[in-house]
Amino acid sequence: MSTGFLVEDVLHLATDEKQSKSVDSRISFGCGRVQTGSFLDGAAPNGLFGLGMDKTSVPSILANQGLIPNSFSMCFGSDGTGRISFGDKGSPGQGETPFSLRQTHPTYNITITQVSVGGNAVNFEFSAIFDSGTSFTYLNDPAYTQISETFNSLAKEKRETSTSDLPFEYCYVLSPNQTNFEYPVVNLTMKGGGPFFVNDPIVIVSSEPKGLYLYCLGVVKSDNVNIIGQNFMTGYNIVFDREKNVLGWKASDCYGVNNSSALPIPPKSSVPPATALNPEATAGGISPASAPPIGSHSLKLHPLTCALLVMTLIASFAIF
């Protein structure tokens, strides 16, 4: 639990048009002062940008003011850049799956019907929440065991078992002179048949005091809820359409989302993807269009500066 202050301020936005206009809106947001419970694990956030379905969230406020359609998108680039666009309802050709809404405390919950690891597909159904405020993906059984054990059986490098200081159970040792490696590709099939190719299911970390580099399957075992975190959303423009109650996704580098001219993001000002570990992360991944059973990675390492549950996103705020 987090306690602190709930305040109101003005959010300055720009319309996503050739002649962009400035739009100001009063919003509410919280600043956490005292953190307890799960917020003490890893790093305690100062606050989260409210994007949920509650009436006090930023998209709800903007929609209720008549400024936007009741929808928004978030784009997560493989180099750490990103964009959030309020009012975005997606684009033609995007994948879609319906939200499975609860009557109380609705979340962005979807249903997954198939998991494929390294080309080995298994049909079973489970629900998961798409949560951009969580850095990694959390799964309980049977999904966690199915994905992790299949990944482990196909990984070529030696597994590192002494990883008690890491949240990941399945990590593999890279040799000192190794500059690239291959790993089993993880793909999901959503309810309705839409494929969701996970571009970057791994995390590169440094192991001290051994001085080794490891790559880990970026999935943490959960005791209860399944969460698709930011790492599985990398390389996509993710649309949260609250009017149609569907989740949409389409491959994107996040620099030319919907050909927007509003507040462009300069490529050289990027920051690495969010993580909780002070490790290194790689840029790149496999193309969703090809989705081979084996992906490859080059060790292009950058220091990370952000913490679990604090999504570091170079965000261009736009209203559609």
Regions found by a protein language model. Give the residues of each.
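Active-site or ligand-binding cleft "flap/edge" segments
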Residues: 1-275, 312, 318
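Long, low-complexity, charge-dense
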Residues: 180, 213, 290-320
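C-terminal GPI-anchoring signal of eukaryotic secretory precursors
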Residues: 260-261, 266-306
